[in-house]
Amino acid sequence: MARSLAWRCCPWCLSEDEKAAARVDQEITRLLLEHRRQVRGELKLLLLGTGESGKSTFIKQMRIIHGAGYSEEDRKGFRPLVFQNIFLSVQAIIEAMDRLQIPYSRPESKLHASLVMSQDPYKVNTFETRYALAVQSLWRDAGVRACYERRREFHLLDSAVYYLSHLERIAEEGYVPTAQDVLRSRMPTTGINEYCFSVQKTNLRIVDVGGQKSERRKWIHCFEDVTALIFLASLSEYDQCLEENGQENRMQESLALFGTVLALPWFRATSVILFLNKTDILEDKVRTSHLATYFPGFRGPPQDPEAAKRFILELYTRVYAGAAAGPDGASKGPRSRRLFSHYTCATDTQNIRKVFKDVRDSVLARYLDEINLL
């Protein structure tokens, strides 16, 4: 400090060594100011949620809306993953048919099932005609359809029915995945992945972490300097169990994780954006699977998706309120944290575009205003 003052007021009073040290001090100060300006123009969002809640799909949507999107070459690169998802889905149904003792309705289906089961999904790069025909035939089997209707009893990718409904197109020679095919593709997130997007004058750094339990221990070093949390929760998992644990209800696990995250000291004053995702799957599922069977507290009509959405939002709101209160129900102390909730369909680009605009205009606005970027 004294050297810096002397350098500004009386530089000729300093020795050569002191002048050199002062120049280094000035350069360090300049670099720190430059870094501070860069940081001021960046917002860090932490993306959390249990496995298969839709985090990776949300990131893909951000790339489409605020990034470079997916060129034809990019989409071609997703072909093996689409084929893998199809094989994994059909193999899961075949295994479930045996376990649930559901018979095939066609005599040739057993041969087709054996052919499909002989393929290693993780080594698939093409969709050979014989496999495509076998999968198409199986999907027309009434027994396979009956097994699909019991999908809550086994683990099946959400995208299964989408891909199986587009088999003819996907099996064509020269197939190039569409943007929707890319959005529906599923690969478990492992480790920690960072994505940067530019929204107007703002740089958004979104940190996506693995949703499976085994991945959560890696989150800890992501918690510093977070502008806001985005927590994705699947509305449709109320009647499903964890893939890692066939006994634990997936929605209960998501609620527990939400409470754990809110209780962490790093997030006492961090705004929380709750995306209640997969509205499309919920709307279809409530027709045959009653929410009250798994959550007896639900008193609404059994086939009313709007009532189901409101009830599930209330479950998360209670967890949020509980995290803000002590054991006696009193507030733990003053906090500026707020909860912003939205219903989303992560595979619907227009829905995510609108929802994220709402998020930016509300949750992020005060941060952007502070750094004069609005």
UniProtKB/Swiss-Prot annotation:
Q: Which family does it belong to?
A: Belongs to the G-alpha family. G(q) subfamily.
What organism is recorded for this protein? Oryctolagus cuniculus
Q: Which GO terms describe its biological process?
A: adenylate cyclase-modulating G protein-coupled receptor signaling pathway; calcium-mediated signaling; phospholipase C-activating dopamine receptor signaling pathway
List the PROSITE patterns.
Answer: G_ALPHA
Q: What residue spans carry the region label G4 motif?
A: 273-280
Gene label: GNA15
Task: List the cysteine pairs that form cystine.
Answer: none
Which residues participate in GTP binding?
Answer: 49-56, 183-189, 208-212, 277-280, 346
Tell me the residue numbers annotated for binding Mg(2+): S56, T189
Q: What is the lineage of its organism?
A: Eukaryota, Metazoa, Chordata, Craniata, Vertebrata
| Listed InterPro entries | Gprotein_alpha_Q (IPR000654), Gprotein_alpha_su (IPR001019), GproteinA_insert (IPR011025), P-loop_NTPase (IPR027417)
Under what name is this protein listed?
Answer: Guanine nucleotide-binding protein subunit alpha-15
